[in-house]
């Protein structure tokens, strides 16, 4: 009975252990799976290329904004919305802005390279006031007959023959010359002492053409579509585009011209609006038209300054000498300022004052821009001269004045280059009348700081500013950012790659540090370990070679006649090839070429991510998942690479044994010929050895003084000296007295040797099999005894553990019961004592009364 109970207990324990093992084994293992083409990206800096509709504009050789090196624009640009995506943007740290700045500077420099330097014109100019040839009436409020507008200057220049000089004359604007003495008759060009002056080419046009910046293959441009986006921070309405919208690179100050407008309300953008040192970019939600005119009809003349050098200057003016000017609708402008002030009050909650710049270069203190090839500098003090408090900011009637604001402008022909100091250009005069219409789409403002800005009186003063052209580009690129696509992703799945299983061999870590040619002197086996390293370094060499090629092209672009856009096209194409090669290289190393989903035999490590399988695939995006495992991506890649290397090694070893997998191939005629050849070689070897041994035996016997008569000589078998050769009646050991017969003939000799060899091999093989069988039997018996011992040991300790547990439980129960009884008894005594308190009081009172 006790034995039966023990077996039942053992059966229960066995079922319990088996169930636990089943539960543990029920948990499926996860394996690393490679995905190609996942929607993952990261912030990046890359070379953008341009797209433009070049056919709609002049393609003349010296057009500054010539875009014939750009790709044509896509007639149907695609924009893909990214739902459930939140991306951070920062317009103040955007590489696209820096890149556009460099591109526009390069375009300006490249367009002015072949043009004439007018440094020889830095001579004394004898100037007098200019009067017009005839007079016409003018109703413009900007009319001015002041002789201070232009000067008629004469000067000596070198002719085509270097040793001869002649006197020429030209008309210069007053702002372009400075007097060198007090008689106001001798002048010099304004920038001769500080700058290298270069004349813009006669055919150069400064009319900006819309440029679309595009990302190369492997990169994308993210676009923020929030209507109230201020340029920094997270954006929840994100889409992806291949190219930006058409951006006109308008070089202007104070007022942003011909840009894009806000779709909703006016937007105020600043890197830190509480810091008065930071400029404020105002994007309007409605345009204000500005019409600028140079009314006088100029003519242009050419002055030969030497061989191949011609200076183009103003010859004469037909009509009144009138100043240039710009007209703006007062109603539209005041309404715009009112809405801008209202928006600024949301940030400062004070009276908003607009006033003119406090000082600086003429490019900053005026609204400078290019109109029809002439550089205008307009005084905007009339525009920025208003104050908006809480009362008049709500009064829309105050902005209903339908008159026109006319702001006076000056024209300069010697213009300081905006991209760098110490350089200037001479803009040749444009013949005829000039009129251009533009749309004001934004403002560049700065806020006064210190105690003089009236902030202590509840007033904030804002002034127009400019000069940093990056702010102009930011006003258009604020909603874009460049990202690099990361198409390779890894994630855990339940699928495992079926591989050739084989024990892994440890590879020395020093192998990965070998150079591309470091294994040239090693064996083929040792060099095969570093094949992956060699592929990587080969790709790096290709990339480096292409990079050097681009540097050489960039350095010699003036010889190759390449524009900055042509260089960018080359860079974009090379970059796309590099990206593709890099991804395909990794897929090839991992054994995943041509696959979008590639399973591996690398187990997923829970330390990389402790999230469950369902949580990963059902609740996370690829972007979130990549951020989760970003720190372990390199480790995972290396494990996949090692697993693939081991797999290829196993496949090579398997292919080496593949011919043994089909026994029928053993009977192939080619194999039979091989078998016959081997048999003949073995027989020939045995015969040769037999002949050698026979010759050696003969030589040995000859040295002993005798020689056998023939191979048929019977040699008596030696017997012991103390035993007779025979026994009576024919008995005894007759077999031991017989002679050994030598074989007769060549075939008999070969057969005897082969038979002896086979018998020897058979006996040895039989002995080995018997020994192996005896050993296996002994080991099996010992193993069975050890297994039974372990089972009995486990059963014994199980019983002991069970008895100990029962004893511990009984002891605990008894202790708890005794403790409980005592607690109950104490509680009862306390309760009775409380109940007896009134009785004791009554008894005490009775005794006191008695």
From Swiss-Prot:
Annotated motif YXXL motif, positions: 706-709
GO biological process: clathrin-dependent endocytosis of virus by host cell; fusion of virus membrane with host endosome membrane; fusion of virus membrane with host plasma membrane; positive regulation of plasma membrane raft polarization; positive regulation of receptor clustering; viral protein processing; virion attachment to host cell
Di-leucine internalization motif, short sequence motif: residues: 849-850
Residues in coiled coil: 627-661
Cytoplasmic side: 700-850
Entry-listed glycosylation sites: 84, 126, 133-134, 139, 152, 156, 184, 193, 226, 230, 237, 258, 272, 285, 297, 327, 334, 349, 379, 385, 397, 402, 433, 439, 453, 457, 605, 610, 619, 631, 668
Keyword Transmembrane helix in annotation: yes
GO MF, one annotated term: structural molecule activity
Top-level taxon of origin: Viruses
Record-linked CDD domains: HIV-1-like_HR1-HR2
GO cellular component, one term: host cell endosome membrane
Position of the signal peptide: 1-28
Extracellular side: 29-678
Post-translational modification (record): Highly glycosylated by host. The high number of glycan on the protein is reffered to as 'glycan shield' because it contributes to hide protein sequence from adaptive immune system. Palmitoylation of the transmembrane protein and of Env polyprotein (prior to its proteolytic cleavage) is essential for their association with host cell membrane lipid rafts. Palmitoylation is therefore required for envelope trafficking to classical lipid rafts, but not for viral replication.
Record keywords: AIDS, Apoptosis, Clathrin-mediated endocytosis of virus by host, Cleavage on pair of basic residues, Coiled coil, Disulfide bond, Fusion of virus membrane with host endosomal membrane, Fusion of virus membrane with host membrane, Glycoprotein, Host cell membrane, Host endosome, Host membrane, Host-virus interaction, Lipoprotein, Membrane, Palmitate, Signal, Transmembrane, Transmembrane helix, Viral attachment to host cell, Viral envelope protein, Viral immunoevasion, Viral penetration into host cytoplasm, Virion, Virus endocytosis by host, Virus entry into host cell
Family to which the UniProt record says this protein belongs: Belongs to the HIV-1 env protein family.
Domain-level remarks: Some of the most genetically diverse regions of the viral genome are present in Env. They are called variable regions 1 through 5 (V1 through V5). Coreceptor usage of gp120 is determined mainly by the primary structure of the third variable region (V3) in the outer domain of gp120. The sequence of V3 determines which coreceptor, CCR5 and/or CXCR4 (corresponding to R5/macrophage, X4/T cell and R5X4/T cell and macrophage tropism), is used to trigger the fusion potential of the Env complex, and hence which cells the virus can infect. Binding to CCR5 involves a region adjacent in addition to V3. The membrane proximal external region (MPER) present in gp41 is a tryptophan-rich region recognized by the antibodies 2F5, Z13, and 4E10. MPER seems to play a role in fusion.
Protein name (record): Envelope glycoprotein gp160
Chain's gene name: env
């Amino acid at each position: 009975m006790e034995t039966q109970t023990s077996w039942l207990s053992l059966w229960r324990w066995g079922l319990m252990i088996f169930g636990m093992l089943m539960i543990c084994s029920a948990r499926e293992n996860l394996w690393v799976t490679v995905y190609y083409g996942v929607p993952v990206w990261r912030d990046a800096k890359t070379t953008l290329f341009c797209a433009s509709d070049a056919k709609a504009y002049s393609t003349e050789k010296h057009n500054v904004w010539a875009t014939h090196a750009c790709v044509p624009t896509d007639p149907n640009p695609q924009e893909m919305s990214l739902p459930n995506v939140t991306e951070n943007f920062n317009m103040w740290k955007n590489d696209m802005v820096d890149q556009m700045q460099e591109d526009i500077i390069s375009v300006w420099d490249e367009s002015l390279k072949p043009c004439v330097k007018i440094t020889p014109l830095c001579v004394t100019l004898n100037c007098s006031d200019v009067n017009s040839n005839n007079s016409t009436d003018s109703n413009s409020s900007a009319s001015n007959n002041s002789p201070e507008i232009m000067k008629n200057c004469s000067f000596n220049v070198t002719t085509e023959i270097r040793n001869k000089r002649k006197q020429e004359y030209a008309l210069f604007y007053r702002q372009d010359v400075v007097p060198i003495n007090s008689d106001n008759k001798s002048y010099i060009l304004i920038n001769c002492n500080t700058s290298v002056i270069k004349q813009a080419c006669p055919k150069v046009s400064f009319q900006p053409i819309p440029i679309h910046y595009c990302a190369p293959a492997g990169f994308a441009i993210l676009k923020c579509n929030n209507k109230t986006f201020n340029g920094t921070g997270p954006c929840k309405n994100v889409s992806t585009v291949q190219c930006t919208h058409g951006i006109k690179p308008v070089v202007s100050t104070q007022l942003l011209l011909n840009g894009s407008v806000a779709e909703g309300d006016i937007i105020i953008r600043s890197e830190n609006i509480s810091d008065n040192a930071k400029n404020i970019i105002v994007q309007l939600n409605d345009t204000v038209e500005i019409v600028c005119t140079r009314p006088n009809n100029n003519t242009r003349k050419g002055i030969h300054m030497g061989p191949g050098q011609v200076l183009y200057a103003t010859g004469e003016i037909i009509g009144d000498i009138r100043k240039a000017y710009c007209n703006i609708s007062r109603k539209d402008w005041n309404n715009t300022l009112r809405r801008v002030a209202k928006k600024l009050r949301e940030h400062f909650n004070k009276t908003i004052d607009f006033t003119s710049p406090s000082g600086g270069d003429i490019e900053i203190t005026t609204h400078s821009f290019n109109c029809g090839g002439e550089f205008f500098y307009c005084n905007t003090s009339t525009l920025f001269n208003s104050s908006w408090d809480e009362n008049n900011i709500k009064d829309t009637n105050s902005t209903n004045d339908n008159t026109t604001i006319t702001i006076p402008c000056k024209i300069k022909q010697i213009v300081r280059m905006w991209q760098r100091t110490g350089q200037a250009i001479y803009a040749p005069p444009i013949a005829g009348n000039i009129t251009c219409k533009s749309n004001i789409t934004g403002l560049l403002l700065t806020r006064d700081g210190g105690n003089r800005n009236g902030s202590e009186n509840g007033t904030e003063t804002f002034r127009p500013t400019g000069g940093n052209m990056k702010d102009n580009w930011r006003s258009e690129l604020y909603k874009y950012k460049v990202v690099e696509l990361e198409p390779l992703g890894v994630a855990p799945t339940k699928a495992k790659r079926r591989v050739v299983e084989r024990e892994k061999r440890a590879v020395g870590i020093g192998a990965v540090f070998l150079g591309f040619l470091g294994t040239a002197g090693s064996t083929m086996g040792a060099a095969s370990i570093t094949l992956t390293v060699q592929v990587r370094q080969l790709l790096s060499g290709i990339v480096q070679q292409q990079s050097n090629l681009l540097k050489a092209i960039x350095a010699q672009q003036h010889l190759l006649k390449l524009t900055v856009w042509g260089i960018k096209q080359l860079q974009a194409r090379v970059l796309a090839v590099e990206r593709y090669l890099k991804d395909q290289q990794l897929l090839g190393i991992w054994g995943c070429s041509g696959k979008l989903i590639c399973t591996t035999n690398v187990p997923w490590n829970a330390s990389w991510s402790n999230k469950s399988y369902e949580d990963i695939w059902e609740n996370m995006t690829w972007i979130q998942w990549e951020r989760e495992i970003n720190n372990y991506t390199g480790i995972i890649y290396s494990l996949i690479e090692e697993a693939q290397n081991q797999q290829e090694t196993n496949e090579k070893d398997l292919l080496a044994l593949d011919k043994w997998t089909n026994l029928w191939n053993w009977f192939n005629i080619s194999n039979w010929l091989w078998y016959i050849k081997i048999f003949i070689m073995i027989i020939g070897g045995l015969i040769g050895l037999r002949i050698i041994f026979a010759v050696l035996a003969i030589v040995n016997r000859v040295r002993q003084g005798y020689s056998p008569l023939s191979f048929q000589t019977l040699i008596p078998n030696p017997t012991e000296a103390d035993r007779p050769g025979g026994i009576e009646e024919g008995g005894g050991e007759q077999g031991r007295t017989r002679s050994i017969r030598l074989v007769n003939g060549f075939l008999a000799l070969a057969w005897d040797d082969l038979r002896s060899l086979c018998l020897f091999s058979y006996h040895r093989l039989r002995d080995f099999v018997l020994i192996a069988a005896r050993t296996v039997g002994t080991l099996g018996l010992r193993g069975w005894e050890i297994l039974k011992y372990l089972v009995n040991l486990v059963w014994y300790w199980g019983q002991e553990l069970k008895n100990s547990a029962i004893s511990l439980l009984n002891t605990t129960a008894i202790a708890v019961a005794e403790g409980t009884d005592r607690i109950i008894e104490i509680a009862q005594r306390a309760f009775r004592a409380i109940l007896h308190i009134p009785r004791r009081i009554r008894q005490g009172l009775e005794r006191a009364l008695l």
